[in-house]
C-alpha cells in the first residue's frame, strides 16, 4: 500500500477550511500558491539528478531561497497552522513546514516521510537503503545521536529511544496528534469560537 505523503498537508487544509469564515475562504488562491511552489521546485531541480541531490536542493529552496522558517519566540501560535499565513509570511511551526515539505516531496516523487517523534515532527529521507533525518524547524539534517539527546531531554537521562520512534509515522496517529496540537493552540489563545468550530468539524467527520 502506497504511503500517503500528502496526508498531513490535507489535514492542514482541513484545519484552514474548518476555522475560516466563509466570506474569507480563498481555497483557489491557496491551491495556486502551493502549485506555484511545486512548479518552481520542478524548474530548479533537474530531473536527471539523483534523489540525494534533489532532496538537498529542495531543502535549500524551501528554507534558503524561499525563506520559510520557524520563529523561536512565536512558533507556538495557532496562526502557524493557518495556511494563508504560512504561505504569505513564510513562517510556521515544524509540523506545518514539514507538511509542506512532504507535499512538495510527493509532487516531486522524492522519498521523504514523516516521523512521529515524541518532541516534534521529524522527517526521514530514505535513499539507496540509507536513512537521513531532517529537522523541519530549520531544514537541517539531524543525527541519531542528536535525536537521542532530544529524547532524553523529554523523558529523562538514560531513556532509550525505540525503533518505532524513528520509523515512518502511522498516518492515523500523525493526524490525531496534529488535531490535538491545533485544538490546544486555539484554546490556549482563548480563540474559543474557532476551537468550537474545529471540534464540530472533526465530530462531523466521525459521523460520516
How would you label these PLM feature ranges?
Residues 1-208:
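A structural boundary/capping signal
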Amino acid at each position: 500500500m502506497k504511503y500517503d505523503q500528502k496526508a498531513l498537508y490535507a489535514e492542514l487544509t482541513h484545519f484552514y477550511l474548518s476555522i475560516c469564515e466563509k466570506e474569507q475562504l480563498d481555497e483557489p488562491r491557496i491551491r495556486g500558491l502551493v502549485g506555484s511552489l511545486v512548479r518552481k521546485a520542478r524548474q530548479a531541480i533537474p530531473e536527471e539528478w539523483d534523489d540525494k541531490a534533489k532532496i538537498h536542493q529542495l531543502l535549500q529552496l524551501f528554507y534558503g531561497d524561499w525563506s520559510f522558517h520557524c520563529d523561536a519566540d512565536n512558533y507556538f501560535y495557532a496562526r502557524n497552522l493557518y495556511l494563508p499565513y504560512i504561505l504569505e509570511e513564510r513562517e510556521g511551526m515544524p509540523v506545518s513546514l514539514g507538511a509542506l515539505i512532504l507535499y512538495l516531496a510527493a509532487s516531486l516523487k522524492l522519498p521523504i516521510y514523516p516521523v512521529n517523534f515524541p518532541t516534534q515532527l521529524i522527517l526521514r529521507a530514505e535513499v539507496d537503503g540509507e536513512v537521513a533525518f531532517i529537522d523541519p524547524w530549520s531544514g537541517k539534517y539531524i543525527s541519531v545521536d542528536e535525536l537521542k539527546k532530544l529524547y532524553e531531554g523529554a523523558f529523562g537521562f538514560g531513556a532509550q529511544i525505540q525503533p518505532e520512534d524513528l520509523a515512518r509515522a502511522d498516518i492515523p496517529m500523525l493526524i490525531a496528534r496534529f488535531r490535538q496540537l491545533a485544538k490546544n493552540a486555539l484554546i490556549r489563545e482563548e480563540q474559543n469560537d474557532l476551537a468550537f468550530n474545529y471540534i464540530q468539524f472533526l465530530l462531523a467527520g466521525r459521523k460520516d
